[in-house]
């Protein structure tokens, strides 16, 4: 068996220690005497595969699942090129074919051969593993299923060419690495340069879940569709009353356009200084990125908005075509102004410049979408719609009466208040 250490493109895996240990055991299979005394290493490998199954939700042939996990996560010159254009031409194909030949040998290896050396059925068990938990601590079910399905295809490949075609198709269709497997990310500024890490537990909110606000949703959809389709689009500011669905709309947009290559990176004010590092990492990838800032506003003493202005406008470098900024805020003017500011501006020789500097951030957002609080009739319509969706059985008159009482005690008229009321009723009914 050719050693994994001879790979050119696919090497230095993040979780490659298990791969090295397993391939060493396989390479030594023709020299049984060498394997004696390595029982601990063998059982440690089985242990790691089972632990990975618990973490990632893998089932079936855990060895194949693990190998597939390595391949779909490895970002190299070949995989990232396939992500953009699909099949590629040139010398790099020869290197990829060589590496896939090695991996095909790993897929084709019969783990039961190891049972001849180590008297146990562990190898057989991990080739038909029944997972007690269908969930995953790292992936959602959709991602886990894609990896397991690809593992089955690769195991059935009759040739290295077919093996390679399956990998190229996966890279083109779903992408490679964390950007290909995940929808949303947060910024980790504890390392230099800052990096993005996946958010694994995403709320499955859809735009249709948001009752009303059809004009606002259409404006958001039109801009986002233009963006994912490669047409000119604008940065978006969603502003208005609290609890009106601004943040839910962003989550809905992500879930609606994820399959078309949309990804979201969540950023907070203290991370604005890291945005240039993040943009540099994603600007050449085959995805559309929305940098999402929730509940954005600035006090008069906060200067982070200047970082944001610089990022939006860009410097000498051309602004990437695959990045937009979407923000939500309860304020139309993001930088707070007070009446006392007028007194201070009397001593400012260029007071109009000072005012314009504070207003200029909003002007960077080409599309502003207003979400206003519903009136009483709209609120009641939201309640009735949500009650029907959640199969709340209650006479309409009683439902609306209780909803009116609820909103008076819990924050007033808003979609959030309506949802909280319905959640209360559902929880109450389940306890009966």
Across the structure, where does each feature detected by a protein language model lie?
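Conserved catalytic/switch belt of AAA+ P-loop NTPases
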Residues: 280, 284, 299-349, 353
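Conserved AAA+ ATPase "SRH/arginine-finger" region at the nucleotide-binding site
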Residues: 329, 346-359, 366-380
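Walker A/P-loop
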Residues: 235-267, 277-283
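Walker B catalytic acidic pair
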Residues: 294-296
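AAA+ P-loop ATPase mechanoenzymes
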Residues: 1-211
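Pre-Walker A (pre-P-loop) alpha-helix and adjacent loop at the N terminus of AAA/AAA+ ATPase modules
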Residues: 202-236
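C-terminal alpha-helical "lid" subdomain
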Residues: 368, 372-432
């Amino acid at each position: 068996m050719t050693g994994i250490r001879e790979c050119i493109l696919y090497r230095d895996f993040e979780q490659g220690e298990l791969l090295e240990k397993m391939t060493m055991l396989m390479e030594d299979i023709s020299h049984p005497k060498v394997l004696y005394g390595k029982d601990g290493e063998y059982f440690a490998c089985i242990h790691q595969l089972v632990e990975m199954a618990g973490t990632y939700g893998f089932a079936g042939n855990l060895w194949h699942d693990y190998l597939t996990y390595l391949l779909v996560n490895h970002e190299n010159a070949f995989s990232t090129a396939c992500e953009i254009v699909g099949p590629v031409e040139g010398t790099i194909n020869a290197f990829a074919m060589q590496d896939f030949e090695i991996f095909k040998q790993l897929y084709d290896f019969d783990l039961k051969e190891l049972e001849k050396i180590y008297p146990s059925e562990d190898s057989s068990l991990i080739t038909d593993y029944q997972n007690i938990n269908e969930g995953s601590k790292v992936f959602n079910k959709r991602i886990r299923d894609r990896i397991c399905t690809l593992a089955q295809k690769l195991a059935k490949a009759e040739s290295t060419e077919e093996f390679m075609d399956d990998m190229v198709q996966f890279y083109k269709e779903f992408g490679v690495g964390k950007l290909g497997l995940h929808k949303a990310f947060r910024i980790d500024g504890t390392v230099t340069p800052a990096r993005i890490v996946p958010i694994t537990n995403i709320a499955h909110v859809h735009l249709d879940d948001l009752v009303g606000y059809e004009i606002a949703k259409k404006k958001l959809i039109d801009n986002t569709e233009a963006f994912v389709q490669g047409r000119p689009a604008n940065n978006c500011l969603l502003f208005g009353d609290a609890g009106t669905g601004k943040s839910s709309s962003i989550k809905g947009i992500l879930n609606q356009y994820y399959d078309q290559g949309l990804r979201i990176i969540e950023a907070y004010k203290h991370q604005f200084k890291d945005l240039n590092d993040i943009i540099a990492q994603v600007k050449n990838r085959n995805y559309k990125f929305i940098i999402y800032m929730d509940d954005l506003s600035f006090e008069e003493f906060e200067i982070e908005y200047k970082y944001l202005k610089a990022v939006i406008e860009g410097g000498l470098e051309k602004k990437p075509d695959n990045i937009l900024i979407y923000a939500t805020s309860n304020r139309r003017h993001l930088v707070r102004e007070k009446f006392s500011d007028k007194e201070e501006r009397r001593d400012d020789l260029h007071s109009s410049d000072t005012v314009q500097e504070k207003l200029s951030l909003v002007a960077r957002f080409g599309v502003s979408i207003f979400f206003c609080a519903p009136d009483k009739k709209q609120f009641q319509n939201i309640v009735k719609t949500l009650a029907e969706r959640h199969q709340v059985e209650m006479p309409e008159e009683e439902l609306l009466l209780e909803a009116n009482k609820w909103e008076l005690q819990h924050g007033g008229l808003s979609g959030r208040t309506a949802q909280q009321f319905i959640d209360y009723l559902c929880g109450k009914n389940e306890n009966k």
